[in-house]
Structures are given as structure tokens and as C-alpha cells.
């Protein structure tokens, strides 16, 4: 009997270890997911939400200042709903909540299952949150006003004497500090509207942003008479956008499976072609 109990105990211990390291196939069904609210997928993003990541305007009564994510338009909104579908959720079971960018990395409980907000995956951020695999890869670019001296820049060295700006807490700001290393301390702004205003009013000579956003700023004339001066070389592993989850949330396994499927079946590529401008012709600033 003792021997039999030992065998049973050993079997139970083995099963528990296996479940921890390798979730069963059914674990990604809605009923098995680690969610804020059962039966509902809660997704966070900032307010306002910006093109090309969110689009479609703001329906009457919406919480969002513009580009309500529930329209399913814009790259990140479309990706979020595609992930939700892979996880077994109908669109009606998806709820969006407002999460300011600067609050994403604070410790403690989260109000969302995952957040999409053009968040670049970095080692420092991984200390406080869990990231999904990448759903978009990009590099940094420079935007300036047409005809200004900075637009003649052909290299990173040509930018040393100019005043640059970026949004707080972004890899764009880090790129300025670590790679461009201008003579002047770069200006830091709370959101993209403030960054754009800095360029419009002449407070800065140029904006550093991810390349798709650079083409939206210029193409949609968010900053009138602006131009993409060029794109910067990828340094290290490059810039990857990942969904943000609470630190250690095992939901990431299922989100990663969904993203892998969307990559394999061509959905991510189709959504990029639909919502994000081509950046092939941007000159490289070495």
C-alpha cells in the first residue's frame, strides 16, 4: 500500500509540474483564460487614440476623444480584435478601458487583460510587465518642417547641433539619447499632440518617432508642411511592439499563440498593408 501511494503521489507531482511548464491544449479556450472578468476580454489603450493605430472617428457618447477603438479600425484595434477572435471571443465580448501610457509600467494590479499602445519591448520595461511576442517591427525616423536647415541632414552627425523632441518614456527618446547624442538636451512631451505642437511652434527643430507615425504626421498633415527627413539605422535588436500584460500573467502564452497564427496566415501583413503607410522610400540617416 505504501508503495502504491508513493507511485500515486509521484504521478500527481509529475502532472502538476507538466501543467505548469506546458499548458494543456484546452487552456486557451475562453473558459480557461486568466482574465479580469470571466467571459470578457478587457483591452487597454490610451485616450486619445491616434492614427494609424486607431481610426474610424468617435461615435456619439464615446469615452474616447477621437478614434474609438471599438470601431475595429486602425492597425492596433484590428490586431486586438483579431487576437480576440483567435482566443474565442466575439467582438461584443471585447471591452476597452483607458490606460494612460505613463501608467502602464507601474507595479500592482492591472485594469486590463492586455494593452496595445505602440509599446516597444525593452529590458527595463520587462522588469515590471510581461510582453507578448511582437505584432509589429519598426525603426525610428526624423520629422521636420519643410525648408528648415535640419531637412538638409544626410547623417546622424549632421543632427548634433539641433534641438530634438520625443514623447516621454518612449524608445524614440532613448534613441535620441543613446544614438544621436545631440549637443542640446532633447525636449520631452507627455503625448504625441504635445510633440507635434512643439514642432509647429518652433520649440524644437525635429521630432523622432517610429517610422509609420512619421508618415502619418506628414501625410495626414498633423503637422502642416512637415516632411520625413529620413529613417535611422536599427541598433541592436530593433524596435518591436508587444502587447502589455501584468507581470507573470500566463495569458501571454495564449496571446502569443494567437499572434503566431496571425503571422502565419498572413493576417498581420494584410492589416499592415491596409493601415500603415509604406516606408520604403525614406532615406537612411547613418
Short names for language-model regions:
Residues 12-21:
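Bacterial lipoprotein signal-peptidase II cleavage site
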Residues 23-116:
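Extracytoplasmic small-molecule ligand-binding "clamshell" domains
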Residues 43, 48-50, 70-87, 119-121, ...:
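Bilobed "Venus flytrap"/periplasmic-binding protein-like clamshell domains
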Residues 79-82, 86, 148, 163, ...:
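Extended ligand-binding regions for polar small-molecule ligands
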Residues 92-158:
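Acidic, polar ligand-binding/catalytic clefts
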Residues 103, 119-128, 177-178, 200, ...:
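A ligand-binding cleft/hinge motif common to bilobed small-molecule-binding domains
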Residues 136-144, 219-257, 278-286:
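Periplasmic-binding protein-like
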Amino acid at each position: 500500500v505504501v508503495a502504491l501511494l508513493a507511485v500515486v503521489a509521484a504521478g500527481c507531482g509529475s502532472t502538476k509540474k507538466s501543467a505548469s511548464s506546458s499548458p494543456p491544449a484546452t487552456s486557451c479556450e475562453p473558459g480557461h483564460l486568466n482574465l479580469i472578468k470571466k467571459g470578457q476580454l478587457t483591452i487597454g489603450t490610451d485616450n486619445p487614440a491616434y492614427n494609424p493605430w486607431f481610426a474610424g472617428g468617435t461615435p456619439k457618447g464615446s469615452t474616447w476623444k477621437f478614434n474609438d477603438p471599438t470601431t475595429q479600425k486602425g492597425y492596433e484595434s484590428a490586431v486586438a480584435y483579431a487576437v480576440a477572435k483567435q482566443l474565442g471571443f466575439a467582438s461584443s465580448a471585447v471591452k476597452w478601458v483607458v490606460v494612460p501610457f505613463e501608467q502602464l509600467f507601474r507595479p500592482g494590479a492591472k485594469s486590463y487583460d492586455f494593452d496595445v499602445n505602440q509599446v516597444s519591448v525593452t529590458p527595463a520595461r520587462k522588469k515590471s510587465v510581461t510582453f507578448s511576442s511582437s505584432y509589429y517591427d519598426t525603426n525610428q525616423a526624423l520629422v521636420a518642417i519643410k525648408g528648415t536647415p535640419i531637412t538638409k541632414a544626410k547623417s546622424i552627425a549632421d543632427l548634433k547641433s539641433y534641438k530634438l523632441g520625443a514623447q516621454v518614456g518612449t524608445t524614440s527618446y532613448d534613441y535620441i539619447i543613446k544614438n544621436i547624442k545631440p549637443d542640446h538636451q532633447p525636449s520631452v512631451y507627455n503625448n504625441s499632440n504635445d510633440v507635434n505642437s512643439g514642432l509647429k511652434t518652433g520649440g524644437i527643430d525635429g521630432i523622432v518617432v517610429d517610422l509609420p507615425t512619421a508618415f502619418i504626421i506628414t501625410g495626414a498633415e498633423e503637422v502642416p508642411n512637415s516632411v520625413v527627413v529620413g529613417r535611422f539605422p536599427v541598433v541592436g535588436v530593433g524596435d518591436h511592439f508587444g502587447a502589455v500584460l501584468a507581470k507573470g500573467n500566463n495569458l501571454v502564452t495564449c496571446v502569443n499563440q494567437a499572434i503566431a497564427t496571425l503571422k502565419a496566415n498572413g493576417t498581420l501583413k494584410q492589416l499592415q498593408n491596409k493601415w500603415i503607410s509604406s516606408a520604403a522610400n525614406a532615406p537612411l540617416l547613418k
